[in-house]
Amino acid sequence: MELDLSLDASGVEIPEPLNGSLFAHDSWVPVLQQWIELVRSNPDLSCPSVVRQAPEVSLGLHFTNDAGIAELNSQWRQKSGPTDVLSFAALDDTPDWLEGEAVELGDIIVSVDTAQRQAQNHNHSLGYELHWLISHGLLHLLGWDHPDERRLSGMLALQERLLDSTGNVLPKGQRPVEIE
């Protein structure tokens, strides 16, 4: 499966020690491809049939700051203030996909400011936090949601599996988020 990734990190202050490596197109393409392939190739995991069949998928990955994501959060979710990640899915249930065409998944927007704070609060790296947030956004693009604790637990477990598949693991016993 091919991945057409549109990545935008313009206007984001990149922390000095990173030199932009976490915000580079070539860093994210293989990670996202592997995650999508893991979900779409496993019949036990929920995934739209068009994604399972598509030779190519495309998505947008946008890094912004708290002000940028707060504006989107207000406009699209009617919630004030920043959040960590937003996803805007492009897939719907219409059967108008033609075999052989690329499938547009949608867009993932991440606040680097919030990601930095959360990484510090959870005592892990910004890189791990970005992978965690982007995996969460990707699962939303693939139709996953968490309206209740059971579905949230399942989604968080799959996020851990995705990160583990690309070598983003935390020390034994440490969880990326606290499940209440």
Curated annotation (Swiss-Prot):
Subcellular location: Cytoplasm
EC number: 3.1.-.-
Cofactor, how bound (note): Binds 1 zinc ion.
Gene3D superfamilies in alphabetical order: Metalloproteases ('zincins'), catalytic domain
GO MF assignments: metalloendopeptidase activity; RNA endonuclease activity; zinc ion binding
Main subcellular location of this protein, as a coarse class: cytoplasm
Cofactor(s) listed: Zn(2+)
GO cellular component terms, A-Z: cytoplasm
Binding site for Zn(2+): 136, 140, 146
Any Pfam family: YbeY
Domain of life of the organism encoding this protein: Bacteria
Homology family: Belongs to the endoribonuclease YbeY family.
Function: Single strand-specific metallo-endoribonuclease involved in late-stage 70S ribosome quality control and in maturation of the 3' terminus of the 16S rRNA.
Name of the protein: Endoribonuclease YbeY
